[in-house]
Amino acid sequence: MRKTNEFRDDIKSMTLEYYPKMTEYYLEKLVNEVNKDFMLHNTFIAHRVGEVVPTDCLVVVSCWAKHRKQCISAVKYILEDLKHNAPLWKKEFYSDNREKWVEKNT
């Protein structure tokens, strides 16, 4: 998590909310897709939910493949896909006590 957003707001924390069955289905589908498309042996994705603060790790991605280039390409794809398409709802809390739901992930 970054300390500022695209508007340069000073972010104190963020809450990530999700609907468990929908998000689990989405992640499972993404894993199956990248395993097939990037010829991976297997992939693991874990995404934080709940309250996070700047510098917290939000995502862990691990891939197994015959060649590391396949994994590097797959991880890049996964991170971009999660950022733009994952069914996660984000609410930012700012240092000036404002709060706002994130409408678009950039």
Tell where the protein language model's regions lie, with residue ranges.
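N-terminal, polar/charged subdomain of small-to-medium soluble alpha/beta proteins
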Residues: 1-57, 64-106
